[in-house]
Amino acid sequence: MSTPQRRSILRIIWRIVGGLALVLIAAAGWLAWWATHGGEAWLDRKAEERIHAVIEQASVPGYNFTLGRLKADARHGRLTVSDAELSFEPRLLDSLRTGAYQYLFAGKVAKAELRGLSFWRLLLHGEFRVGAIELQGPEFHYYTGPKRVDLADPFKRLGHGGNSLVSVLFTDTLSIADASATVQDLNKDLPELKVNGLSVHGTSVRVSAAGRNAGVRLAVAGTDLRVDSISTLLPDGSNLHIGAVALSRTKQNGLLTAIRITPPPTDSMSVDRMAKSVMTLAVDSLVMAGLDFDRSIADEALFIHRMGIHGLHVAVDLDKSLPEEPPEPVRLPPAALASMPFSIRVDTLALVDAEVHYRERDAKTGRWGEVPFSRMSAQFRNITNDAAATTDSITGRFNATFFDSAQVVGTYAAALDGSEKFSITTTVTRLPLVEVNRATQPLMRMQVEKGILNSLTMRMEGNARRAKGTMELAYTGLLVRVEPGTPTALRSSMFGNVMDAMLQQQYGGGMTADRERNFSIERDPDRSMLTYLWHATREGLTRNLVPEAKERMRTMVRTDLDNWKKERAARKVKK
């Protein structure tokens, strides 16, 4: 190509580039003029119209959404919403009670701000993309009915009017600060739940149309949730309070602190009081690791790899001087798990530094006895009601200090195949028996003066109807008598004089034994696992102690007979 031709082509190229530059400059100038002479206002107005249309199209029948004020700012990519409220018509409450709806939702927020909004993308492509959404101090209200709740239910009902004006809503961050929430069960199975100081931080939040008449899909990359406090009233009138809560989908962990269950005040003058267990509970912290948020929400279940309960303190009082309540069936642990309305799986449950203090008031003595457990720790595995886990078993081991002195260790296993079969082994070692006076004196008028329980081992196997097992019991120097001050008639009915005579030094003094006995018991349907174990323990102790008492009676008879013979022989010698 000759030099003149090349110069001609270059001149043409430069003219084209220059022309394009002039066009761009002109377009930029026109855009600047347009923006300063009502263009931005037009863009703001069109964006507001589009948003109002989207809200109208997305509305679910029976729900009403109102906006106090919607202000678009195209120059700064900002959208501000004031006094927004979502409510539902009262007639929907009947639909909730009949099961037509699974739950209802209402809420309002004084101010919501969206920053980094692309207005042109919204108008041209129907994509609502923002850098951040912030809601300050909103209020949320949930109402549930008799049906099992599907959290995705409202999303399925959106977009049934056809093609959506907005196909995608995406934000880099979603922040909800200082919110409050209530959950109310219209079926009256659960009391109202109050949540205060709720904060949520989500990242890469995306809501997209799933297809014509197919609702919408929600996807979130990461979520962190914090709560200042949660409170509610339990069915028995006790107050449940939970302090700070922190849950993280990103880290798959959770923390609940300062959990408290406080019974209602006791009205000593009430004629309706019944003999029932009154429990006070406190937990320092509940720590969850491996918390599967996605499966928990998608499957309406609770999946946790490890849960730790730290600083559990339980106090239970039972006043047996009051009339007994009508018996109600009580399920053993596997059956109780199976009856839960949602799926649960906890791979490992650990109990750290727990205390249990049981008090009981006897109807005859009118006094309170106590049984304390301290420094308790335990670990249980495979706690689940998953139908696919029927070939598995719940297993666990535990240890504690009994009456502030003896050591208790044990194991537990329960089948998950519906048979309710279980096995438990418990060993108690080195208990100074005078410690049990805190229970035996006020409840039984029996006083232990000395003796050591060297070891007690109980092995028990059973199901929800009956159990059997063995008890090995070894004790040294047991000396027990009817409590001083017991009325004479009552002391006689308790064979107090016989007991005093049996344990005299001439008959051997304190009893010592090392034996093993079998036992079998039937379970009342209203008996919990703990009372089931106490029934077995009492039966095992009876079968071990009665033979020793009978042997001591025979020793008394033989000794008295020998003494009588010696005295008779001595009298004959004197004659």
Briefly describe each language-model feature range.
Residues 133-136, 307-311, 374, 454-464:
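Short secondary-structure subsegments characteristic of cysteine-rich extracellular domains
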Residues 2-18, 413-415, 427, 444-575:
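Extended terminal
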Residues 322-323, 328-334, 338-346, 350, ...:
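Long, K/E/R/D-enriched contiguous segments that form extended
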Residues 151-163, 197, 273-275, 325-338:
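Short amphipathic alpha-helical linker/capping segments at the junctions of internal repeats
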Residues 147-155, 322-329, 444, 486-492:
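Flexible, surface-exposed loop regions and adjacent strand-edge segments
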Residues 192-194, 207-246, 256-268, 367-444, ...:
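Interface amphipathic segments
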Residues 2-61:
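N-terminal type II signal-anchor transmembrane helix
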Residues 53, 58-147, 159-187, 203-257, ...:
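Flexible beta-edge/linker motif
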